[in-house]
Amino acid sequence: MSIKVAVVDNYDSFVYNLVQYLGELGAEPVVVRNDAVDVAGLRALEASALLVSPGPGRPEHAGVSSAAIAELGGEGLPVLGVCLGHQCIGQVFGARVVRAPEIVHGKASPIHHDGRGVFRDLPEVFEATRYHSLVVDADSIPDCLEVTAWTAGGLVMGLRHRTLPIEGVQFHPESILTGAAGHDLLGNFLELAAATASPRR
């Protein structure tokens, strides 16, 4: 499906793995650094979807990421946040981002999920790679968000906005250790974005 996806690069080495997957799935990714563009510049790209990448640090240090989620996502542009991007989604809508019980760097964990949205048709439980020291606090999720994925220990691994086409995943779908489920998750996001862009198609 040939849809343009604006990719906000939060200075992370995984960004081009995401871009490669998007290209393999037929999308047209356009990568912009988080400090090289503002929301108006992103809007001018006329993309059909926005992907906010992983990266170091906290959401408030992720340049245009949070403003883009709030403004463009708030206008109905489909958004997928990955790792730091997922944390940005949580914080934008009022959740707290806190230290994780343990720092994980390249750890594969079983992910449980609700089988909807970007998780449609994925295995009920799949292994995904995690690189993070922060998590969205499960006790602070606002009414507008729902938890869509979690670890066996109850850590939040996915979020979805209840009325806007915005989803986030804490794990890395583009990691080789995540495997086919990550590729399929990104494919689901592109399908959702295409359906949002062309509701009567």
Label each region the model flagged:
Residues 3, 44-121, 186:
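Cysteine-nucleophile active-site neighborhood
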Residues 28-36:
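A short beta-strand-loop structural module common to alpha/beta enzyme folds
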Residues 83, 132, 172:
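Histidine-centered divalent metal-coordination motifs
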Residues 171-201:
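Acyltransferase
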Residues 115-163:
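Catalytic beta-strand/loop cores that center a nucleophilic Ser/Cys/Thr
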Residues 5-25:
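Short, charged N-terminal beta->alpha structural module
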Residues 108-110, 156-158, 168:
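Conserved hydrophobic/aromatic beta-strand scaffold that supports enzyme active sites
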Residues 4, 28, 48, 78-80, ...:
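Structural signature of beta-strand start/N-cap positions in the alpha/beta core
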